[in-house]
Amino acid sequence: MKFEKAIRMKAKLRLALTGPSGSGKTYGALLIAQGIGGKIAVIDTEKGSASLYAHMAEFDVLELDPPYTPERFVEAVQAAEGAGYNVLIVDSITHEWSGVGGCLELVDQIANAKYRGNSWSAWNEITPRHRAFLDALMRSPMHIIATARSKTETAQTEQNGKKKVVKLGMKAEQRDGLEYEFTTVLDIVHEGHFAVASKDRTGLFGGDPQPISVETGKTLLDWLESGAETVDQLTPALEAISNAATVDNLRKHYEAAVELLGERIEIKRAKNARYRELTAPPEQTAPEQADAA
């Protein structure tokens, strides 16, 4: 074991935009994506709402219909990676949690079908699936902008012997602790396209509401690119897979690559190509073909 000096490396954007319905999350995400630049893709679970903004930016869209299982989101993320997009907007990740076929609904189904209504046991099955969804976002080679619907969180208190419901603020409709996954979380103020950072590792956003614009994306990109060069871990992993001498060797190299870099489409393609090569029947020489005849 050896400790080394901490260095901030170049990174990809991991941004969450939260806000109530109609606050402009999709619009804001597209503005920021424009500032980052490159090919933009949108996973749209909001019934075509992203396409309403086709006039303001050039982007491709995948309209994702129910069921909103974690696996369908992972598949969509991998499809965007394989198509070579630079920025992916997931609009919105709330559906993976509380939408039709999302985690909450899956827990109820599994609890009733297998555990006599015991949701604790059902969560043991769903939590790894939800974790795989988050890992697909966090380990992606693309810049990720995720939107999440927020709602007013309330609590019941007692004052002078009387029960009273008090507002605690806005909370994203996703699993608790979601904010820890992202570099920055911007909470959109309903009145206009302004946002307040509820979490910010970049130090770019103060405590006051700031307008969301194309410049927001450019500023974030400058910060992301100002770090030191990252070590290329993908190339040696792909080379190890492509040069595997046996199927067992291939499996070990593939599992090591997934553990390090996640289930990326390039890794999967390299594994499948090498597997076909290793399992293909050997080519017959001319004398062998004559003998076989």
Where in the sequence are the language-model features?
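Short, basic, glycine/proline-bearing loop/turn elements
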Residues: 12-19, 55-65, 114-122, 159-160
